[in-house]
Structure formats: structure tokens, C-alpha cells
Amino acid sequence: MPSTLQALTKKVLATQPIFKDDYCILERCGLWWHEAPITIHHTCIDKQILVKTASFKHGLTLNVALMKAVQENNHDLIELFTEWGADISFGLVTVNMECTQDLCQKLGARKALSENKILEIFYNVKYVKTSSNIILCHELLSNNPLFLNNAQLKLRIFGELDALSINITLDNISFNEMLTRYWYSMAILYKLTEAIQYFYQRYSHFKDWRLICGVAYNNVFDLHEIYNKEKTNIDIDEMMQLACMYDGNYTTIYYCCMLGADINRAMITSVMNFCEGNLFLCIDLGADAFKESIEIASQANNWILINILLFKNYSPDSSLLSLKTTDPEKINVLLDEEKYKSKNMLMYEESLFHIYGTNT
């Protein structure tokens, strides 16, 4: 809650519809940043406050807005964002002048951030899914000594990127580059078009990374765009293998299949990664590597997969195979997350119902 009546008044004013005739009032009230009015909005799911201006039109969390205000040594906004609920400790991440550091400490910040607090800050800011937030987090944090020297963060980022790094060795790149790749991957995961274009324009040499993330995070629209725009060094079967590592990647599995990837290898990869949904899709698409898949499932003592693979009445789904398209719009409709269910999965579940008298 705002700590003063003035801060509360500004907060209420910032939530109102803005007209150009009101700009002079907002500027006098301190609701002005980068030559434009400040407005606040709330996220739909967790009701977090998002600060918006012309420069950050998709919105920043209060804490990220605070970090930017501290970097700019904008004391009025530092006080305002703190009164609106920002954690003043976040300001220590970007502080660059003694007078601003003194203000942060006056507002309640500690003298220095512990390694655990730095880690907490990173994971606090990473989850807000707006282009403005992702881009600014990259600009403020990717080359920030507090984060570059955090051993715990290095281990966690290494772990998150390791599975995706099919054509690079993480040991051979700097942590700064790892963080850049991480924020790029978040833009693709959350399907943030403007953030994706920001990274694509500034890091054109990461084109393979964009494609990898599009495959792994089931972003068939971005995968299609980059695959048709750039020459890639990644084999189509490598792309399919990556898609099959994450259950539910139906659109990118289908896309790779239509480009000619080996669907039997995809089936085997799905079993190796215990991805039941992907396995059924591969069967729908004509995969028949049952012998090899049963051997893998048996070695893992995975009786759920073994029983699925022992069922004999599977057949390809002609409705999937007849379309033969790489159009992401059509693929997305065909494999809609809420509507699509594998024909062969339904057949298998029906067989269990007849045996046990209950749905699985």
C-alpha cells in the first residue's frame, strides 16, 4: 500500500484513462518518464502492478521499473515506486552513484546484497511475461557484476540451458552470453514477438539458438519464421529429437515430421524421455518402432509405457497425415492444446476401460 496520501493519489490517477489534454497535469504530479505519462495496470493472473510508458508499452513490474529508475538516478521515481510497493533492495542491483545508494538505504535497503538475495531478485523478475520486462531485464542484468559473479545463479542457468545446447558447449562461452541466451529463450517460451525481434536484430549470430528454442518450447510460429528465413546448421532429425524431449510439444513434432524427420526415431526419443503424449502422437503419425521402444521401456522398468507399447490395435491417424502442411496456423488448429487428443490414446484408454471397467 502507498505510504502517503500523495502516493495513493498518484496511484489512483495513474490507473485512469489518459488524454493528451491531461499530460501537463501528469507531468506536474511526477507521473512522467522518458517524456511520456506513466500509467499502471494489473496482470490478469496474479494482479501484479505493471508500470507502462511509451518506452515500456508492454509494462514493467514495479521492481524492474525501480531498477531502471535507480540506474537513471531518478530520485523522484525511486521514491514513488517504493511507495507503490517496490522492494527497495532491488535498487542495489543497478545503483551507480553514492547519492542514489544513500537514498536507497534511507528508504530501507541493506548495505549490500547477499548471494541468496541476488538469486531471489533474479527469479522474481524473470516470471513476468511482457516484452518490455524481458528486454529490460536483459539490459540491466546480463552484464551486471552482481549476477556474473553469483556461483549459485551460474549453476542454475547452466542447468536450464544444458538440455537445449545441442550444438554449443556451454563451458566454452561466457556467463554473460549464457544470460543473453537465457533471456532470448524466455522471449520465445512466452511467445513475446517484440522481444524476439529485439534479440534477433541484436544477436543475429544466435539464429540457431532461436530455432532450438522454438522447437523445444513448442513455438511453431517462431520456428516456422526462423526456419524459412535463415540457413541453419541443425539437422531436421536433431530438431525432432529436441522436440520429443518435452512432453506436449505436438505442434513442433508435427512440423518436423512434415519436413521429413524420422518419426520412428522420434518415437524412440519420446520413450527414452518418458513422454507419453509425444509417444501417442508419433504413433498417430505412423511410427512403428515398437520392438526397440519396448526394450528401452523395459530397461527403465516403466510398466506404463510397456503396457502402452504392447497394445496391438494402433493405426496411423489419416486426419493428421492427409493435411501435409507446415503452415503454423493450420498446425495450431489441428493440434490445439485444449481440443486435440490422440486417436490412438483414446483407443488404448478404451481398451483399459473394457478390461478394468474404469477410465484412466
UniProtKB/Swiss-Prot annotation:
InterPro entries tied to this protein? ASFV_MGF360 (IPR002595)
GO BP term (any one): taxis
Please indicate which superkingdom the organism of origin belongs to: Viruses
Q: Record's family?
A: Belongs to the asfivirus MGF 360 family.
Task performed by this protein: Plays a role in virus cell tropism, and may be required for efficient virus replication in macrophages.
Give the protein name, as stated in the record: Protein MGF 360-1L
Q: Which organism is it from?
A: African swine fever virus (isolate Warthog/Namibia/Wart80/1980) (ASFV)
Organism taxonomic ancestry: Viruses, Varidnaviria, Bamfordvirae, Nucleocytoviricota, Pokkesviricetes
